Amino acid sequence: MAANVPLSDFLATAVDAAKRAGEVIRKGFYVKKNVEHKGQVDLVTETDKSCEDIIFNCLKQQYPNHKFIGEETTAAYGATELTDEPTWIVDPLDGTTNFVHGFPFVCVSIGLTIGKVPTVGVVYNPIMNELFTGVRRQGAFLNGVPIHVSSKDELVNCLLVTEVGTKRDKSTVDATTNRINGLLFKVRSIRMAGSCALDLCGIACGRADLMYENGYGGAWDVTAGIVIVEEAGGVIFDPSGKDFDITVTRIAASNPLIKDSFVEAFKQAE
């Protein structure tokens, strides 16, 4: 079916779904939330669940034969294997902790893989009214305006974004803080804003120069952002310098000029 449908049609459907879910997020942002715990610091709200339903219903109406992977359905029913079939991979509310605290760095993330390749990406922050889109070989955009990664070529001039994840065992926390400590001597500054998808979009539009995350939640965190970064001229890779593998939950992104320097700095900080 994917071979007979223009990618622009997939994009339009994803944008529609993201905006519908985004309206629910926007309305829920300013009211008291009913919060559940998936882990010590990993939260989920009724908004996460209702937004996933909205998105999947919208997508399934148009593409009933496609496959679907979502953060909340995966948490409830277990992982779904990624195949070569057209597959929609959805995080209905990336940045749930931010949402709960009223910090406006939240988004809907909708990605489509075809042949396991991220092909269409939509990331929508309804609080800041920013819509990032990308289609393979067709460019990346913020609210319809073309975007491009930065041109920084020295680490000392770079802004690095990362996340600390949700694991709080001592070995993970020590490794995370030691790594950040080492990298902080190499770059201009470091930011942690609480949304992997929006971190990737920050690389795509040049707000930040480097991004990495060890142990992100799942493919729903990165699929859409990968398309947007690559279409904005950026590169996606494993922080070790190896090729990116979506099943390993390690990701890095940058402009092509700074990748090698970052990989070397990352190895030294490990």
Curated annotation (Swiss-Prot):
Pathway linked to the protein: Polyol metabolism; myo-inositol biosynthesis; myo-inositol from D-glucose 6-phosphate: step 2/2
Family as reported in the entry's similarity comment: Belongs to the inositol monophosphatase superfamily.
Broad enzyme group: hydrolase
Residues reported to bind Mg(2+) 2: D91, D94, D221
Name of the protein this chain belongs to: Inositol monophosphatase
SUPFAM superfamilies, sorted: Carbohydrate phosphatase (SSF56655)
Database matches in InterPro entries: IMPase (IPR033942), Inositol_monoP_metal-BS (IPR020583), Inositol_monoPase_Li-sen (IPR020552), Inositol_monophosphatase-like (IPR000760)
Activity regulation note: Inhibited by Li(+).
Cofactor needs: Mg(2+)
Binding residues for Mg(2+) 1: E71, D91, L93
Binding site for substrate: E71, L93, D94, G95, T96, G194, S195, C196, E213, D221
CDD domains recorded: IMPase
Reported function: Responsible for the provision of inositol required for synthesis of phosphatidylinositol and polyphosphoinositides.
Catalytic activity: a myo-inositol phosphate + H2O = myo-inositol + phosphate
Source species of the chain: Mesembryanthemum crystallinum
Any one GO biological process: inositol biosynthetic process
